[in-house]
């Protein structure tokens, strides 16, 4: 094969062109000015409970700017990506030298955001979907540990770290008590465990604690959002029943509504990824983020000099790592997948969560791992982002009959900033060490993904003067699948944008 036809050679050539393009386009990242002028307009402050709102002790960041009627709450997993932008801005003085007042305020706001999440854990035992009482029947992907890492790396405040780790332990306990399932001896066979480690032999899934009255109301909401295709399946399932708690018969349509409410906890509301069986799936991203939680507790208590606790969390994180490598990993593809807890087998749905093991730095750093990751990028990354799920027409590895016939926004062709970020950081983690060529390819792909993200954001900002919730993975435009009228956004779109703009072109 001639080098001009080789995708690898083209990517190597691209890395040279990339550095040239970064220098040439430095002046073109004009949306940074919009971010600087407007980030504070996304901050609200409601210290007291008010109607459905849960009062928070500090000002908190929301996904939208003042005046927008949607997303006025503080959302759990959104906050991680919002903080990435605040921290990038707050620690990269625009004119060199000392940070100015606004930059210092951005850093302080990031700390306020995490302190608010810690407050919610101490109040409720976990972080809810958002600071509304009506959203306390579910959480969102557990990124508190990642946020604690980000803050402590900058402040080195050990007193704050001790407080944060205490809350993180409580949150971890909640996930293990409320969102986990025991494994069979055959599933953990071969994994080294200690005398008191049997309680850790569990995998986690997304779920909810809604009662039937809430699920009935939620099903009506789904009818309006997802359309007649949802209604058809819901009504058909309601012709049958299942035996629930206390031996009571319940219509099967409620189980469908419950699965979709659990998708809301995953953050992927809604998607074909779980095939409307979310509670039956040990989600790869969830278990990877809980591994990161355990690793944060292990390393955090080591920093604080508490060796006993550190060793305990190190052991727990190693057990989870072994479980993920044993049950979620497929040696034939070299990739990690979701795990079906009802069928006790891999759930083969090609999706962007497959980059999460690399985001949390779980797999080994060797050539085999890196070449498999290169192959995954070829399959899952589009021109302007990462496919949430591949269309079934090209997902040749899928082994399921799709029962999700309604429109879903966490699917092709939508590109979501959180998934882009997880992928970029995962590739960066493995763009070093053994294997020069695959490492180089991962580095180039990471930079290409950042640049295409910036290009997409800048292109639409030039046309509209706004950031948006999601973009088209193929065109970089706003021709996306919506489950509701897409609002102009700030939140994770602006946060990821600001981090990449400052990382690639500097202050």
Residue ranges and their predicted role:
Residues 85, 147, 293, 300, ...:
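Core register positions within helices of long alpha-helical scaffolds
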Residues 277-304, 409-432:
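Long, repeat-rich segments with strong aromatic
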Residues 79-80, 87-91, 144, 166-169, ...:
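Extended, hydrophobic/aromatic-rich amphipathic alpha-helical segments that build helical scaffolds
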Residues 28-73, 112-131, 185-281, 322-415, ...:
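Extended glycan-interaction surfaces of carbohydrate-active proteins
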Residues 120-164:
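Aromatic/His-enriched, Gly/Pro-containing loop or helix-boundary segments
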Residues 76-117, 353-365, 420-432:
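Alpha-helical support elements that line or immediately flank enzyme active sites
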Residues 32, 95-117, 157-176, 293, ...:
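Extended, well-ordered alpha-helical scaffold segments
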């Amino acid at each position: 094969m001639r080098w001009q036809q080789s995708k690898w050679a083209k990517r190597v050539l691209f890395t040279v062109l990339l550095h040239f393009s970064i220098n040439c386009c430095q002046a073109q990242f004009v949306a940074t000015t919009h971010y600087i002028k407007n980030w504070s307009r996304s901050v609200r402050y409601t210290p007291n409970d008010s109607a459905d709102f849960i009062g928070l002790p500090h000002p908190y960041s929301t996904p939208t700017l003042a005046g927008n009627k949607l997303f006025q709450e503080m959302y759990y997993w959104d906050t991680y990506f919002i903080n990435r932008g605040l921290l990038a801005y707050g620690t990269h003085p625009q004119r060199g030298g000392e940070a100015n007042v606004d930059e210092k305020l951005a850093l302080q706001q990031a700390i306020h955001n995490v302190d608010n999440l810690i407050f919610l854990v101490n109040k409720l035992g976990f972080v809810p979907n958002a600071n509304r009482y009506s959203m306390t029947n579910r959480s969102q992907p557990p990124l508190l540990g990642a946020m604690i890492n980000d803050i402590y790396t900058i402040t080195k405040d050990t007193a704050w770290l001790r407080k944060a780790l205490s809350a993180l332990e409580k949150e971890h306990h909640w996930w293990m008590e409320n969102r986990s399932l025991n494994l069979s001896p055959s599933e953990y066979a071969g994994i080294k465990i200690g005398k008191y480690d049997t309680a850790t032999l569990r995998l986690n899934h997304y779920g909810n604690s809604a009662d039937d009255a809430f699920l009935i109301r939620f099903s009506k909401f789904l009818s309006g959002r997802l359309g007649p295709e949802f209604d058809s399946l819901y009504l058909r399932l309601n012709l049958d029943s299942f035996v629930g708690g206390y031996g009571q018969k319940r219509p099967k349509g409620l189980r469908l509504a419950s699965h979709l409410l659990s998708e809301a906890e995953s953050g992927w509301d809604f998607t074909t990824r779980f095939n409307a069986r979310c509670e039956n799936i040990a989600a790869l991203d969830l278990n990877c983020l809980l591994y990161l939680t355990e690793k944060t507790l292990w390393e955090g208590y080591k920093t604080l000099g508490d060796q006993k606790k550190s060793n305990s969390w190190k052991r727990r994180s190693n057990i989870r790592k072994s479980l993920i490598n044993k049950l979620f990993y497929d040696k034939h593809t070299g990739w990690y997948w979701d795990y079906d807890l009802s069928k006790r087998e891999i759930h083969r749905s090609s999706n962007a969560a497959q980059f999460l093991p690399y985001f949390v730095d779980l797999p080994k750093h060797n050539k085999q791992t890196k070449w498999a990751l290169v192959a995954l990028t070829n399959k899952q990354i589009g021109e302007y982002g990462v496919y949430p799920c591949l269309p079934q027409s090209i997902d040749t590895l899928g082994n399921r009959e799709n029962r999700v016939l309604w429109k879903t926004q966490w699917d092709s062709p939508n590109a979501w900033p959180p998934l882009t970020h997880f992928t970029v950081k995962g590739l960066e983690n493995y763009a070093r060490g053994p294997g020069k060529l695959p490492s180089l390819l991962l580095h180039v792909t990471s930079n290409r993904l950042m640049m295409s993200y910036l290009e997409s954001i800048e292109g639409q900002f030039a046309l509209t003067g706004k950031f948006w919730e999601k973009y088209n993975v193929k065109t970089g435009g706003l021709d996306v699948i919506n489950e509701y009228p897409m609002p102009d956004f700030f939140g994770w779109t602006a946060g990821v944008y600001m981090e990449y703009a400052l990382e690639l072109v500097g202050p």
